[in-house]
Every structure is written in C-alpha cells, then in structure tokens.
Regions:
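N-terminal non-catalytic structural scaffold regions of very large proteins
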Residues: 1-167
Length: 167
C-alpha cells in the first residue's frame, strides 16, 4: 500500500470506530445514566436560570483565570499544541468598530483561535439539577464554548468546537 492508500484506510477505520463509540454512548451509556438519575447536559441545551447562572459563575471564578487564548494571524506563528490535550478551536472576526489589538486585522476577516482546556480543573462539573435527587453534569469544554466570546472581546466568534491532537 502507498502512504496515501494507508491514510485512506486509516481514515475509514477511524470513522467506523468513532461511529461505534458514539452509538455506545448514545444508545447505552446515556440512557443508563439517565435511568440512574444522572443527566449530562450540553451548554446549548435549555438550561434553567439557576443552571445558567451557576455555569457562568463557574466560568468566571474557576475557568477564566487559567485560560490562555491564542489567535493566529500572519504576524504570530502557529502555537505549539501539546500532544493529547483537549482544545477549543474558534473562528473569529474583528468587530467592525473595534480599534483594539492588532491593527493589521481587517474587520470581517476570519482568524483561527485556540484555547487549551485546562487539565487542572475537573472535566465533568456538577451543576444544579432540575429535579431533587438527580445529578446533572456538564463537560468543562461545554462551559468554555458557552463563554468563549469573553476571551476575544474585540472579535465576533463565528463558531467554536473542541478538538484533540494525537501524534
């Protein structure tokens, strides 16, 4: 097999494994957790007012102080992203009326930004539940995604998604 053929086969097999992984999560693990009274929520779901306030306060008090957001452009080299770290990648564009930061950035021009999900904090965060006796949790990367606009004040965040580099 050529290198190109090997990469294609690896990609096909990897996609199959990820499909199995998500089927197991969505068809077995999440229903079993919910049956036991544990709920995994996403930041974009309809959180209650108490849950939203808790998540935003948790971000401000615990997460924000340990984050190092980095935006890439022609004047800054691509940062070293450590192996096996979880990161949030975002597409950002400079706000129309912003004169802060890098003057070379044109309003509307898309830039790539990244922030490493801190390993010093727990990945799963318990938040207030809707129902007494239940446990509700949210992933740390969901909390960061929900508040990522607070990291890039002079920019509009177009989208943000978690990624992990494996070498």
């Amino acid at each position: 097999m050529t290198a190109k053929e090997q990469l294609k086969e690896i990609s096909v097999r990897t996609h199959e494994l990820v499909h199995v992984q998500y089927n197991t999560l969505n068809r077995s693990l999440i229903p079993a957790l919910e049956k036991a009274g544990m709920h995994l929520v996403a930041a974009h779901e309809n959180l209650t007012e108490a849950q939203s306030a808790f998540v935003d306060r948790y971000f401000e008090d615990n997460v924000y102080p340990v984050l190092t957001p980095m935006a890439m452009d022609s004047s800054r080299p691509f940062p070293l992203i450590r192996n096996k770290t979880l990161n949030i990648g975002a597409l950002i564009s400079k706000k129309e009326k912003s004169d802060k930061l890098n003057k070379k950035d044109k309003a509307g021009e898309l830039l790539f930004a990244t922030v490493q999900v801190p390993s010093v904090l727990p990945r799963v965060v318990q938040i207030p539940s809707k129902k007494d006796g239940d446990t509700t949790v949210i992933l740390l990367e969901e909390i960061i995604e929900r508040n990522i606009d607070k990291l890039f004040l002079s920019y509009d965040v177009v989208c943000a998604h978690p990624y992990r580099i494996m070498r």
